Amino acid sequence: MTIAIGQNQERGIFDLIDDWLKKDRFVFVGWSGLLLFPTAYLAVGGWMTGTTFVTSWYTHGLASSYLEGCNFLTAAVSSPANSMGHSLLLLWGPEAQGDFTRWCQIGGLWTFVALHGSFGLIGFCLRQFEIARLVGIRPYNAIAFSGPIAVFVSVFLLYPLGQASWFFAPSFGVAAIFRFLLFLQGFHNWTLNPFHMMGVAGILGGALLCAIHGATVENTLFEDGDAANTFRAFTPTQSEETYSMVTANRFWSQIFGVAFSNKRWLHFFMLFVPVTGLWTSAIGIVGLALNLRAYDFVSQELRAAEDPEFETFYTKNILLNEGIRAWMAAQDQPHENFVFPEEVLPRGNAL
């Protein structure tokens, strides 16, 4: 008879750390948490600090904090001054030289929030990968979350990198984002950009699919319990489905003439539409960073210039964009001291 005696393998420091990080607790930490939690905490903390106390007087000539009288919709952490270029604006860098007050004044909090926010989003994506692997499911949640990451990185980092400085990035605030949207329209004609059109179709299409799917499932729930409502009839361990896919298919076949007959294809489509919309929007913003133009219908512009009675919605929008540029530039970039004489301001029956 042979007796095999096993020896306990000596566990290294990596194994001990791995065990602690993946320990079953109320809030899972994991290796991704080492990136997610510090960066997300600092990004949110930096934004709350900036919107509460820090002025934008030295960067945009604006009041932007609760301390100065702003509210939740008008407060913001504003982008750095144009003169700062694409500097990382480190607290210990040559611009601030360790002076926290000066660092806040020149816009250091914006780069702080933008960079930590980017890494926080990446950490959250990695968290979904990590937990999916531990639970034993596919990582489509993490893949879907690549869409918001792509939009954030393209808007807040890649667009200003293609422009003159961080100054042209959106500031972190509600009204500040609206100002940025007007800027994109006036200077890039963003709404006529095909990538923006695909993005709108993806986001609104995803919302439509979500509403239809939720309503259809609610409509076809099996009432297989004796409780007061159908929610209690569901148990997490039940073997049968909770709603009738066959009935749902029958319903939409009668409505449209076609319907999803496969749950996998249905849910993949619900994943694909909004994520593709986010990615196409991100690609479009990278195009704006390089100053790529949207659709130009020059023949309509030439005819409108020759014939005062000819006008289209396109030529209307071109005039409106000229107005946005002329009246916004002086307000938006006070450091340039723009002065536009009356004869260069846009004219026409569109305005």
UniProtKB/Swiss-Prot annotation:
<feature type="binding site">
    <location>
        <position position="213"/>
    </location>
    <ligand>
        <name>a plastoquinone</name>
    </ligand>
</feature>
<keyword id="KW-0150">Chloroplast</keyword>
<feature type="transmembrane region" description="Helical">
    <location>
        <begin position="151"/>
        <end position="164"/>
    </location>
</feature>
<keyword id="KW-0813">Transport</keyword>
<dbReference type="InterPro" id="IPR000484">
    <property type="entry name" value="Photo_RC_L/M"/>
</dbReference>
<feature type="transmembrane region" description="Helical">
    <location>
        <begin position="123"/>
        <end position="139"/>
    </location>
</feature>
<dbReference type="GO" id="GO:0009523">
    <property type="term" value="C:photosystem II"/>
</dbReference>
<keyword id="KW-0479">Metal-binding</keyword>
<keyword id="KW-0148">Chlorophyll</keyword>
<feature type="transmembrane region" description="Helical">
    <location>
        <begin position="277"/>
        <end position="293"/>
    </location>
</feature>
<feature type="binding site">
    <location>
        <position position="260"/>
    </location>
    <ligand>
        <name>a plastoquinone</name>
    </ligand>
</feature>
<dbReference type="InterPro" id="IPR055266">
    <property type="entry name" value="D1/D2"/>
</dbReference>
<dbReference type="InterPro" id="IPR036854">
    <property type="entry name" value="Photo_II_D1/D2_sf"/>
</dbReference>
<dbReference type="GO" id="GO:0045156">
    <property type="term" value="F:electron transporter, transferring electrons within the cyclic electron transport pathway of photosynthesis activity"/>
</dbReference>
<feature type="binding site">
    <location>
        <position position="128"/>
    </location>
    <ligand>
        <name>pheophytin a</name>
    </ligand>
</feature>
<dbReference type="GO" id="GO:0009772">
    <property type="term" value="P:photosynthetic electron transport in photosystem II"/>
</dbReference>
<keyword id="KW-0249">Electron transport</keyword>
<protein>
    <recommendedName>
        <fullName>Photosystem II D2 protein</fullName>
        <ecNumber>1.10.3.9</ecNumber>
    </recommendedName>
</protein>
<keyword id="KW-0934">Plastid</keyword>
<dbReference type="GO" id="GO:0016491">
    <property type="term" value="F:oxidoreductase activity"/>
</dbReference>
<keyword id="KW-0812">Transmembrane</keyword>
<comment type="similarity">
    <text>Belongs to the reaction center PufL/M/PsbA/D family.</text>
</comment>
<keyword id="KW-0408">Iron</keyword>
<keyword id="KW-0472">Membrane</keyword>
<dbReference type="GO" id="GO:0009535">
    <property type="term" value="C:chloroplast thylakoid membrane"/>
</dbReference>
<feature type="binding site" description="axial binding residue">
    <location>
        <position position="196"/>
    </location>
    <ligand>
        <name>chlorophyll a PD2</name>
    </ligand>
</feature>
<keyword id="KW-0602">Photosynthesis</keyword>
<dbReference type="GO" id="GO:0016168">
    <property type="term" value="F:chlorophyll binding"/>
</dbReference>
<feature type="binding site">
    <location>
        <position position="141"/>
    </location>
    <ligand>
        <name>pheophytin a</name>
    </ligand>
</feature>
<feature type="binding site">
    <location>
        <position position="213"/>
    </location>
    <ligand>
        <name>Fe cation</name>
    </ligand>
</feature>
<dbReference type="InterPro" id="IPR005868">
    <property type="entry name" value="PSII_PsbD/D2"/>
</dbReference>
<feature type="binding site">
    <location>
        <position position="267"/>
    </location>
    <ligand>
        <name>Fe cation</name>
    </ligand>
</feature>
<keyword id="KW-0604">Photosystem II</keyword>
<comment type="function">
    <text>Photosystem II (PSII) is a light-driven water:plastoquinone oxidoreductase that uses light energy to abstract electrons from H(2)O, generating O(2) and a proton gradient subsequently used for ATP formation. It consists of a core antenna complex that captures photons, and an electron transfer chain that converts photonic excitation into a charge separation. The D1/D2 (PsbA/PsbD) reaction center heterodimer binds P680, the primary electron donor of PSII as well as several subsequent electron acceptors. D2 is needed for assembly of a stable PSII complex.</text>
</comment>
<dbReference type="InterPro" id="IPR055265">
    <property type="entry name" value="Photo_RC_L/M_CS"/>
</dbReference>
<feature type="binding site" description="axial binding residue">
    <location>
        <position position="116"/>
    </location>
    <ligand>
        <name>chlorophyll a ChlzD2</name>
    </ligand>
</feature>
<feature type="transmembrane region" description="Helical">
    <location>
        <begin position="206"/>
        <end position="226"/>
    </location>
</feature>
<keyword id="KW-0560">Oxidoreductase</keyword>
<keyword id="KW-1133">Transmembrane helix</keyword>
<comment type="subunit">
    <text>PSII is composed of 1 copy each of membrane proteins PsbA, PsbB, PsbC, PsbD, PsbE, PsbF, PsbH, PsbI, PsbJ, PsbK, PsbL, PsbM, PsbT, PsbX, PsbY, PsbZ, Psb30/Ycf12, at least 3 peripheral proteins of the oxygen-evolving complex and a large number of cofactors. It forms dimeric complexes.</text>
</comment>
<keyword id="KW-0157">Chromophore</keyword>
<feature type="transmembrane region" description="Helical">
    <location>
        <begin position="39"/>
        <end position="59"/>
    </location>
</feature>
